[in-house]
């Protein structure tokens, strides 16, 4: 079996991070990794805050947040006046859901590739308002055309108040044809929220090119920002309807400031986020994207080969730029949340490798990521040792 050639490592890239060198960190997609330069920038801001907290919070902080927001919005291809910084995609989705004023009979439509925490937020809002949540099953092997048709026929104009779709799915590492899905929903008058948790830094598509009513993406994954940094982008017709989860002193300032200002929080991560973009650009954005996608594809093939998965049975990512890939586990392995957590912990403890393990629709999957600090030999070692560990279950 021919395995694709791995990409050439980016010289010195691993030294930019403070990761434990005794561990193979193959799950960048879950919590990211903050470059040392970004950590230091944030610490300088924290030192400033602690030297004079009153001055830090009361003299110019709102303007400094807006300045950082403009940098991040420009990188995303988004309107800075329509962009609010939030803690993460889950928080941004909650902001949108609670701002819709759902009523009994309304529905929120999603697919079964959605992120679990967002699904929990939908369930809570529906329970509070009397609306209902409906999930469309989408086969892992569905083509883009089939996916669009599934959503088209699933929409119920007049009842569907919101369609939530992923730009790149978390549990299945599948790139969705987001712009086409948004267009289909718009034809039927249904607003769309795009969960773009993994898009910033990984995918080249701009927010404007997608055209969704609401778009929310994490910058603390593939754009090297401190954790707790995400952007919620809202089209003009919705901005005055969007309300913060916590009302505070900037409530009368309108969107986006009233969403951003959540009382006394540590805002230094947002202020340091542009340093993450500088780090990414210094490495070369296109170079990093190509490297990470090629490395993830290599890891998928070598680990899949070790587990006896034929190349044609490896899940397709839906696009060339995807830096996360799935490997099916043997039948019966990690099919439940508890079993997946247990296997992930065993792999971490016994193989010194951090990976994502998830059960989806009755099948367990390993999700592997590629990042500039990874090297091909890390996937090779996992491929050699994983079959023995699985045989010991």
Located regions from the model:
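Active-site phosphate-binding strand-loop segment of PLP-dependent enzymes
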Residues: 132-134, 142-201
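PLP-dependent enzyme catalytic core of the Aspartate aminotransferase-like
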Residues: 15, 335-339, 345, 349-393
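Structural signature of PLP-dependent enzymes
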Residues: 56-58, 257-301
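Active-site PLP attachment segment
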Residues: 210-250
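Glycine-rich phosphate-binding segment of PLP-dependent enzymes
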Residues: 20-22, 30-62
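Conserved PLP-binding catalytic core of the aspartate aminotransferase-like
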Residues: 293-297, 306-350
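Conserved N-terminal alpha-helix of the aminotransferase class I/II PLP-enzyme fold
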Residues: 52-91, 292, 306
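Conserved PLP-anchoring active-site segment centered on the Schiff-base-forming lysine
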Residues: 81-82, 97-121, 132, 339
């Amino acid at each position: 079996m021919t395995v694709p050639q791995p990409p050439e490592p980016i010289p010195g890239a691993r030294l930019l991070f403070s990761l434990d060198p005794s561990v193979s960190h193959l799950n960048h997609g879950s919590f990211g990794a903050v470059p040392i330069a970004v950590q230091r920038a944030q610490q300088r801001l924290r030192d400033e805050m602690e030297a004079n907290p009153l001055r830090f919070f009361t003299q110019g902080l709102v303007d400094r947040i807006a300045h950082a927001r403009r940098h991040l919005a420009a990188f995303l291809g988004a309107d800075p006046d329509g962009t609010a910084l939030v803690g993460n995609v889950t928080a941004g989705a909650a902001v949108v859901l609670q701002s819709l004023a759902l009523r009994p009979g309304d529905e929120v439509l999603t697919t079964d590739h959605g992120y679990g925490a967002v699904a929990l937020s939908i369930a809570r809002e529906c329970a509070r308002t009397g609306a209902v949540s409906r999930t469309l099953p989408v086969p892992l092997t569905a083509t883009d055309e089939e996916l669009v048709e599934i959503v088209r026929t699933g929409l119920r104009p007049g009842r569907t108040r919101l369609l939530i779709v992923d730009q790149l799915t978390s549990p299945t590492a599948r790139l969705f044809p987001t712009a086409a899905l948004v267009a289909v929903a718009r034809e039927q008058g249904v607003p769309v929220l795009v969960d773009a948790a993994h898009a910033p830094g990984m995918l080249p598509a701009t927010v404007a090119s997608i055209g969704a009513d609401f778009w929310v993406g994490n910058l603390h994954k593939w754009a090297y920002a401190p954790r707790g940094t995400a952007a919620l982008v809202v089209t003009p017709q919705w901005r005055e309807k969007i309300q913060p989860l916590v009302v505070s002193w900037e409530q009368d300032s309108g969107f986006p400031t009233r969403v951003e200002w959540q009382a006394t929080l540590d805002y230094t991560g947002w202020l340091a986020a542009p340093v993450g973009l500088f780090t990414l650009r210094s490495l070369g954005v296109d170079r990093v994207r190509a490297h990470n996608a090629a490395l993830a594809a290599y890891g998928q093939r070598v680990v899949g080969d070790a587990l006896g998965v034929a190349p044609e049975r490896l899940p397709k990512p839906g696009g060339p730029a995807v830096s996360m890939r799935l490997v099916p586990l043997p039948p019966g392995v990690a099919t439940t949340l508890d079993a997946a957590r247990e296997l992930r912990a065993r792999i971490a403890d016994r193989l010194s490798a951090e990976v994502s393990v998830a059960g989806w629709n009755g099948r367990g999957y390993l999700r592997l990521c590629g990042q500039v600090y990874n090297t091909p030999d890390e996937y090779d070692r996992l491929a050699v040792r994983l079959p023995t560990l699985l045989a010991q279950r």
